[in-house]
Amino acid sequence: MSQIKENPALVAAQEAQRKINEALDAGYSFRLEAGAGAGKTYSLVAALKKLIDERGSMLVRTGKKVACITYTEVARNEIAQEIEDHPAILVDTIHGFCWAFIRQFQKAIRDLVSEIDDKKEKIELGGGIGSQLVEYDLGFFSVDEKRITLNHDDIPELMAMLLAKEKFQMLFSEQFPVIFIDEYQDTNRKFMDAITEFFLKPKTGHIIGLF
């Protein structure tokens, strides 16, 4: 009588999930290495559901969230649907996530924009930086007397620049004790370098999950 062999992909997925659960229980950061079609999204959703079950009420009560940063809108929508848009989880694309955070700090953004070398000519032509409103809606960089508009690539770069400052590291930490990054290998390099340098390497107490 022949034995039924277990599906190797299923066995690997179960083992990966076990390791993720162990890391979450211990409060450790982790990285899931798996190729396309290896069930990374399933593992990410399962990890989010575990956090919702175990910490969801506490996170909502204290005004904190698990950040789940996706590479595409499609992934964002899929994950948000799977967790039923639970209020303890913020699921967004990297640009949506970064803009939601940095837009709170208008003066800091204006100061940082003025430090970016390839912006200086346009800033000068636009009359300089004063107290304009900084916006991200047109998709290109411009400056006039009333507003500064940011382009697509500015958003993660400015987020990385902001996170280099201790004040904003603390504010970020207060809001997001757990950060999951989907398709981290394709995620903006400056943003990933900032997360690694200021939250992963120093062992800040954050749980960083890289999928």
Language-model regions: role of each:
Residues 1-107:
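P-loop NTPase Walker
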Residues 1-38, 43, 106-183, 189-194, ...:
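Accessory N-terminal region flanking or inserted into the helicase ATPase core
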Residues 99, 188-189:
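Conserved protein kinase catalytic core
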Residues 96, 185-186:
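Short, glycine/acidic-enriched loop or turn micro-motifs at the edges of active sites
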Residues 65-71, 178-179, 208-211:
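Extended hydrophobic secondary-structure segments that form protein cores and membrane-embedded regions
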Residues 50, 196-211:
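Conserved RecA-like helicase ATPase core segment
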Residues 52-56, 162-167, 199:
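Structural motif corresponding to the C-terminal cap of alpha-helices
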Residues 58-64, 173-174, 203-207:
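Short helix-terminating capping/connector loops at secondary-structure junctions
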